[in-house]
Amino acid sequence: MNITIIGAGNMGGAAAIGIARAGKIPASCITVTARHATTLARFSEYGIRTSLDNVEAVKDADIVVIAVKPWIVPEVCSQIRPLLDCSRQQIVSFAPGVSPEDLLGFLEKDGQKPALTYSIPNTAIEVCQSMTFVSRVTATPEQEDEVASVFEGTGSVMKVPFKQLMPGTALASCGIAYALRYIRAASEGGVELGFYARDAVKIVSQTVKGAAALLEAHGTHPEQEIDKVTTPGGLTIRGLNAMEKAGFTNAVIQGLKGGK
């Protein structure tokens, strides 16, 4: 299987590296494109193929991933449309801000529309720790499975109906920034408590990693794990209550709703 990722920015570049690292698809079967050679320099160490020409890059691709900013999508589609083979090639979009109707309209060729699937990873795909959503539009279930298989080994993959794609984006793709903002805030608190900044970041990062590992290992609800730490009258419950008084849970929920 040959994959071409159009766009070597934060998400497209991270996906190319993560897929290569996962090892299911050889790096030599992955091509990533960009407008400038300097953007592509970092991919050589992974054995990923690079190109400055979107048209040439899609010719031999089985799956074409559109990973550019939404306002660049029409331009990219106009470039690759003449070369698309709708009977063979699948399109995967990383741009939920461009509707399926618009995207298929940009790509329609001689009355034919390609198999289209949307996929939303997050930037942790680069280190194979993404939460990636896959949602078919015109693709068959078998084609959707094929797209999902591309992301095997890059973290967790979940197939969802299209109506859940934007909420999923808020929860996981935007959500990684929210998680990092918590780490930043807790680290700043750690500095106030007397730790050097680099040590505080290390402590908080490992604590968050440990919390996630507990949920995965036990299959429990977060509150069950919280209960194991909150002894009556103890420090933890006092800290949690102080956070709630400051609006912690509501702030997180409002942030997720705001990013939807």
Where do the language-model regions lie?
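NAD(P)+-binding Rossmann beta1-loop-alpha1 motif at the extreme N-terminus of oxidoreductases
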Residues: M1-L52, E56-K59, Q129, V191-L193
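Short, well-ordered alpha-helices that flank and scaffold nucleotide-derived cofactor binding pockets
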Residues: G13, I17-R21, E45, S78, ...
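Short acidic capping loops at alpha-helix termini that bridge into adjacent secondary structure
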Residues: P26-C29, S87-Q89, R198
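Small-residue helix-packing motif on alpha-helices
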Residues: I30, L40, A57, V73, ...
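Rossmann-like NAD(P)(H) cofactor-binding subdomain of soluble oxidoreductases
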Residues: A37, Y46, N54-V134
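Internal alpha-helical scaffold of NAD(P)-dependent oxidoreductase catalytic cores
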Residues: D102, F106-A115, M131-P167, Y178-A217, ...
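NAD(P)-dependent Rossmann-like dehydrogenase/reductase catalytic/cofactor-binding core
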Residues: S205-K260
